[in-house]
């Protein structure tokens, strides 16, 4: 089913603006993609509207990830550090939407879980917790999903050291895996050099 809203994303933008009302912080249309920015306090209710509204009807959450804006485009980001970005899909109406919400507290990033709206949010939110340390209130099983249980820190934060904090290895005497401080010595990262095409051709 192809609707006029799907064909003309500006109509989707205008309808979402009307449907969300005061819950909407910002809405933009670029490259035929609609992006909305929500406040953390309005996040869950607004997402429910986007799922249930008959002109939106976003039945699927197809992705949810996080961004650390502490440094961005070689500049210090003004405002909150952590942002969660969700991508919604309406299969029945053939339209998509990007939703951004910033965590209000950099030291304790916390947002409501949307697992109650879309089951697919379960592992996405666990990944955002594991890699960025963002907590999701109401998630029934918020534990690490990619790193191991003894992992220290959140590796996608921009202040996380490249070498990590600890390493693990098999200890033959103890006959088990052990954790120990990382033994990699810091070294200067050499930038990759890409030469122009045909630089070695004879003149």
From Swiss-Prot:
Q: Which UniProt keywords apply?
A: Cell inner membrane, Cell membrane, Membrane, NAD, Quinone, Translocase, Transport, Ubiquinone
Specify the enzyme's EC class, one word: translocase
Q: What is its main location?
A: membrane
- Fetch the InterPro entries from UniProt: NADH_DH_suC, NADH_quin_OxRdtase_su_C/D-like, NADH_UbQ_OxRdtase_30kDa_su, NADH_UbQ_OxRdtase_CS
Q: Which GO terms describe its molecular function?
A: NADH dehydrogenase (ubiquinone) activity; NADH:ubiquinone reductase (non-electrogenic) activity; quinone binding
Q: Which NCBIfam families match?
A: NuoC_fam, PRK06074.1-1
Kindly provide the name given to this protein in its UniProt entry: NADH-quinone oxidoreductase subunit C
**Topology in the lipid bilayer:** Peripheral membrane protein
Q: Which HAMAP family match?
A: NDH1_NuoC
Q: Which family does it belong to?
A: Belongs to the complex I 30 kDa subunit family.
Compartments, record wording: Cell inner membrane
